[in-house]
Amino acid sequence: YRLLGHEVEPQVLRVNLPPRFSAPGLPELNHSQFTAVKAVLQRPLSLIQGPPGTGKTVTSATLVYHLARQGMGQVLVCAPSNVAVDHLTAKISATGLRVVRLCAKSREAVSTDVDHLSLHCMVRALNTPEKQDLRKLQLLKDELGELVSVDEKRFRRLRSSAEREILQAADVICTTCVGAGDPRLSNVNLRFRQA
């Protein structure tokens, strides 16, 4: 086949295929989905296409589950729309993996079904003694609308540190294709071996 105008030699990766291809928390795979998952796990690049309602989201979530379970680092999941990313986030989360949904700062005010998995909501929900300063500053910022310069700098530093912790602990990070360029991903020592 050809990729970007160049002839590409077919490659088969040597991987330990799972004994069972369906993922926990997701529907059993049909024959086409099973074939797709098995093929994708053995190739460096794959394309899955099909009409709406044919199980591409379940197939993708199953693939992500198996890629994450191989222990080769975090998996970055991208889709072109926020709705697609939210659907994938929900399905992947159902498998029991630690999933974080990264959305643009401009979308943080938009409520979704996966808010509890969104980075900004996870940061707000932190309630450990070490995070009390961040929580107090967040409440103050919510109440006043803005912080004085010194408090704003401290707030940003603490929030950035909390975001880094959450992102580094995730098995899977889901975002839009544009969101994959978010500075919060580049400022963190992430271990993406698969996207």
Regions found by a protein language model. Name each.
Residues Y1-S22, Y65, G71-C78, V83-F192:
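Conserved P-loop NTPase motor core of helicases/translocases
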Residues G25-P44, T59, T175:
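N-terminal pre-P-loop "Q-motif" helix
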Residues L41, A68-R69:
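Residue-level signal for alpha-helix termini/capping positions
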Residues S46-L47, L76:
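Short hydrophobic/aromatic beta-strand immediately N-terminal to the Walker A/P-loop
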Residues G50:
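The Walker A (P-loop) glycine that initiates the GxxxxGKT/S ATP-binding motif of P-loop NTPases
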Residues G53:
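Walker A (P-loop) phosphate-binding loop of P-loop NTPases
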Residues T57-Y65:
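Motif I (Walker A/P-loop) of helicase-class P-loop NTPases
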